[in-house]
Amino acid sequence: VNKLYKEDRVKFITQGNFLIDKARDLYRLPVEAPIKYFPNPVDIDPEFDVETYPKKDSIIFIGRIESVKRGWLFCEIAKRMPEYQFYMLGQTFREKSRNESIMNKYHTGIPNLHFTGHVEGKEKFNYIRDAKIMVNTSIHEALPITFLEALAYGTLLVSCQNPENLTEKFGIYTGTVLGDGFDSIDLFVNAIRTLMTDEDKRKKLSVEGHSYV
């Protein structure tokens, strides 16, 4: 990539300003190398009213069911918060048998945890619209389009990733979570409970997140 840049055969764009320095380091680019900001396009529902829509006491996870996403943390959170409904949207792709073997034990015995499989389009947006919080437990992220899709419906963020400071602005950033994350489950539980039990704060952040998108 560095060679292509020097030959003026490649241009750089980014979905998040926080990625610019990372790109310069990764590709050994000079400080003056132009990297233009191109925000992700997000579908906006013109009929959705963030101030009046009756959200449910539901919490969602959207992503591939793979080790890098650490979906088992979402399941453990659900186990500790039986008063809320948890919906896991996604399926396994790479290392399918290994990832399924890790998650199999969570498919029974947790009545408030629901596995939807892969969903898209209207069905996916229905889950996002109804949820009060989206949880992200990934080891690393750039700027997930799901963060923006969630905010477009006033759904707050709880995550150990904070791209563009979106999580701390429109939800709660747990801080860095290393390894398998089992020792940090309470960070997510406490963050979710803080938002779910303070309706005034939740609604305020919900409106602000929607306006941001």
Q: Where in the sequence are the language-model features?
A:
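A short, active-site helix/loop in glycosyltransferases that binds the activated sugar's phosphate group
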Residues: N2-P34, V42-I44
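Acidic anion/phosphate-binding donor-loop and adjacent secondary structure
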Residues: R24, K36-D57
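A conserved mid-protein helix/loop that constitutes part of the nucleotide-sugar donor-binding site
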Residues: E66-R80
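Nucleotide-activated donor-binding/catalytic signature segment of Leloir-type glycosyltransferases, i.e.
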Residues: E100-V119
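Aromatic "clamp/platform" in nucleotide-sugar-dependent glycosyltransferases that forms part
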Residues: I139
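Short hydrophobic beta-strand element within catalytic cores of glycosyltransferases
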Residues: L156-C160
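A short, well-ordered alpha-helix in the C-terminal region of glycosyltransferases
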Residues: T194, K201-V213
